[in-house]
Regions:
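Short, surface-exposed acidic-centric catalytic microdomains
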Residues: 26-70
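N-terminal Rossmann-like dinucleotide-binding module
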Residues: 1-41, 45
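Helix-adjacent hinge/juxtasegments
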Residues: 54, 62-105, 110
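Alpha-helical structural signal in soluble globular domains
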Residues: 17-24, 45, 49, 74, ...
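Active-site-adjacent beta-strand anchor residues
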Residues: 7-8, 35-36, 83-84, 88, ...
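Donor/substrate-binding cores of folate-linked one-carbon enzymes
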Residues: 21, 87-186
Length: 186
């Protein structure tokens, strides 16, 4: 079993998907959920699954480095970090401690639509395909090596919420498969 941490900031659908995925059950040990938002509903999901939760509000720290050092002290035995809707940019200092061991899932076909509100921006641009990317995290926001992508043709009879749900379905299928590949190839 490989010790991992999952970082999330919101509802936690990707966190829950990874934590309950039967194919990952014998491969990863989720040592903790790291959450930067004390009001995030992902915290409740972690409690239901008896997964230790580290709630770290950045507002309680003097600097980003102090915030990240505190997290690092609490996850020192972890081998990989999987970001699942974590809405913070990770500093070069933190990245240096987990070089090549932090993976993110992003709701766009990178390199298109980096950053926030990717689905909405792609939808408003009336793109033919919307998709997801799973990538290693580096110093450039959503700029790391792409590990996997998937997409679907957009039906503009659907609402933005319906398209967003389809994106989440892709995420829930592809993220576990990609994690398995990463961990079994290394």
């Amino acid at each position: 079993m490989i010790d991992v941490a999952i970082f999330a900031s919101g509802t936690g659908s990707n966190f829950y998907n990874l934590a309950t995925n039967p194919e990952l059950k014998n491969l990863i040990n989720i040592r903790c959920l790291v959450c930067d938002n004390p009001k995030a509903s992902v915290i409740e999901k972690a409690k239901l699954l008896n997964i230790e939760t580290l709630i770290v509000n950045p507002k309680n720290f003097d600097s980003k480095i102090d915030y990240e050092k505190y997290i690092l002290e609490n996850i020192e035995d972890v081998k990989y970090i999987f970001l699942a809707g974590y809405m913070r940019i990770i500093s070069p200092y933190f990245l240096g401690k987990f070089k090549g061991k932090i993976v993110n899932i992003h709701p766009s076909l990178l390199p298109l639509y980096k950053g926030k509100d990717s689905i909405k921006r792609a939808f408003e641009d009336k793109v033919e395909f919307i998709g997801i990317s799973i990538h290693y995290v580096n110093e450039e926001v959503d700029g790391g090596q792409i590990l996997a992508q998937d997409k679907f043709r957009v039906d503009y009879k659907l609402s933005l919420d319906e398209v967003t749900q389809k994106v989440h379905e892709l995420e829930h299928r592809l993220y576990p498969k990609t994690i398995i590949k990463i961990l079994t190839d290394n």
